[in-house]
């Protein structure tokens, strides 16, 4: 399932610098780094940030990765500081989806791409209940569409995309 998301993400020109919101323990971070991108990995979990700094220390030393403790709703970047903003399988954890999407738009010059799990993925790709994922997906899609995002829905995941230029 995550392989499908990774393949889908490869089709996007993310530019050179990417803020990754909800980086967790770095699965997507590593893929972005392997694409030759500079990544600012954001998470609210101090353990995840510590892990990223340690596990990817060579990228940190090379200036290709910054791992920053911050909420999705308040990103510590200037307007348009990164080319793109990406989030994979984190949106269902974010309390204020509207604020998070607006923040990703604010810091990205070109593109915002957000992936998350559908209710059908419950128990298959993640430990969440179908009810929980359905509720969060409905909220996220309604907010995103009101903000001008495009929705693509697959069986186990969905994508919200907004191009800025």
What is each stretch, according to the model?
Residues 25-74:
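Class I SAM-dependent methyltransferase SAM/SAH-binding core
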Residues 86:
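A conserved beta-strand element that flanks and buttresses the S-adenosyl-L-methionine
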Residues 94-103:
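A short, conserved alpha-helix within the catalytic core of class I
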């Amino acid at each position: 399932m995550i392989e499908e998301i990774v393949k889908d993400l490869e089709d996007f020109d993310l530019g050179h610098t990417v803020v990754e919101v909800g980086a967790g323990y770095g699965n997507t971070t590593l893929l972005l780094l392997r694409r030759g991108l500079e990544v600012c990995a954001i998470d609210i979990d101090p353990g995840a940030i510590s892990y990223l700094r340690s596990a990817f220390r060579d990228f940190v030393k090379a200036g290709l990765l910054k791992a920053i403790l911050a909420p999705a709703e308040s990103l510590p970047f200037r307007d348009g500081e990164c080319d793109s903003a990406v989030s994979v399988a984190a949106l269902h954890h974010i309390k204020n989806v509207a604020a998070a999407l607006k923040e990703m738009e604010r810091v990205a010059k070109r593109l915002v791409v957000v992936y998350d799990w559908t209710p059908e993925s419950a128990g298959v790709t993640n430990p969440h209940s179908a009810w929980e994922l359905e509720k969060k997906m409905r909220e996220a899609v309604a907010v995103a569409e009101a903000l001008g995002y495009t929705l693509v829905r697959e069986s186990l995941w969905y994508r919200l995309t907004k191009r800025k230029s």
